[in-house]
Amino acid sequence: MKTRTLVICLLALLAIVAAGIYRFMPQRLAQVPDISLVSVAGEELRLADYRGRPLLVTFWSTTCSSCIAEIPHLIGLYRELSPQGLEIIGIAMAHDPPNQVLGMRKSRGIPYPVTLDIHADAARAFGDIRVTPTSFLFGPDGRVVQHRVGKLDMAGLRLEILAMIASQTNSATDPGLPDT
């Protein structure tokens, strides 16, 4: 009897944990949402305008230690690969006080656009993001190439972006016409 009760309790606990994980996991996203954001510098960022280039969108928070630890790596990635077409947009969560986001952007010297998602519109458009860091890498065609909840694998991400850039470069130099 005790074993049966224990098994039932464990199954109930497992169901509760699974439901909690499901609740906080973003819904599947296939393409860049057609939304506009405004950067903290006042620049309008229409995500559809980023087609044709690799785009990394990362949801972060000033209170998220993993997010803060990623910032120097994202800055390095941006400085290395933005001349070749990479775009990065950081979206601060709705619960982040704007003055803290602005302060962190300035103190960390973040060169890529950072936006405030004050009403959580971007979080909803990306599948109801609730956990940080959550990142999406979109290919030049606007499709999701990589979706990550938690810390990014920076080496793998860099290789993925380099492959996209190389593919674009090869497409631009080789139109697929037969040699004559």
Question: What feature does the model see in each segment?
Answer:
Residues 32-33, 55, 132-133:
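Short loop/turn microsegments at loop-to-beta-strand junctions
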Residues 33-51:
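Short extracytoplasmic/periplasmic juxtamembrane "stem" segments immediately C-terminal to an N-terminal membrane anchor
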Residues 106-111, 118-162:
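Thiol/disulfide oxidoreductase modules built on the thioredoxin-like
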